[in-house]
Amino acid sequence: MISKIKKIIGLVSEKNIPKREGEFFEMTVDMSETNDVRSMHIGSPTIQSSMRISDPYHLELDYTQIMALAAIFLEKPKDLLFVGLGGAAIQKFFYRWLSKCNIVTIEINPSAISVAKQFFKIPLNSKRFKIIQDDGIDYIKNAKEKYDLILSDAFEEYGLPEVFCEIPYFEDCRERLTEHGIFMINLWGSDPRTSAYIDRIKLIFEDRVLHLKSTSSGNIIVFAFNSLLNENRVDVLKRKILTMEKQIDFELMVYFNKILKNQKNKTNYLFLS
């Protein structure tokens, strides 16, 4: 049950109108606290992000824990790009776990940025943690940099905007990846178009795609690989997970095993080619 609701309403000025809209509109960001958990809601009761107040870097929601699996696939990463801020849960995780990485987040909603900065313990004074107010579609299309990871988590009031699920967007994201870069996207599990979106990603990334549905929220996390992993062996990746689990406070192996179960390939390799 939502308690202690705090509401921040941001009227976007003409200067900051998101390029995908073209007129004035209100973007409402609600914040709730229940026991030791603070959550963000954008335009509806749906939880966009949650933070454990006593442990701000803990990944409270299971779908964000699934996202953390990207760490075992990354090869000497330097630059990570996130489209969609929310409460910055996964950004903060990678900021701490990958202590030499630069974290850049693109967020279109100024109210979401304001709430995240005030209430979700973002490392504001770090040179490695940057938030840019912009349209994620345009930013990725026009960016010159290459990224080791691009995570697309751009939900609006009623779900995932269609423009973030179209082939041109997936093509632009792949173009912005390093040679062994990873594209990750959070999809809405109840959306009947989700399977079509995954098929589009498979088309663009030549079937080098993994996905898993979270048990509590129904979110589907998709991992797409720009090229074949240098370390593609399941047994080696499991050893990486065991090492990682000794340093974090949640289990990863359970998610990895579920991903393997979804794979048609039953060999010791994630991908055969």
Please describe what each predicted stretch is.
Residues 2-39, 47-54, 220-273:
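SAM/dcSAM-binding transferase cores
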Residues 22, 57-179:
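The AdoMet/dcAdoMet-binding core of the Class I SAM-like
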Residues 34, 61, 215-218:
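A short, structural micro-pattern
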Residues 42:
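S-adenosyl-L-methionine
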Residues 45-49, 155-158:
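A short, flexible beta-alpha/helix-coil linker loop
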Residues 92, 161, 194-195, 233-234:
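Short glycine-/acidic-enriched loop or helix-start segments at secondary-structure transitions
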Residues 100-102, 126-128, 180, 206-208, ...:
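A generic structural signal for alpha->beta connector loops
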Residues 167-231:
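C-terminal substrate-binding/active-site "lid" region of AdoMet-derived donor-dependent transferases
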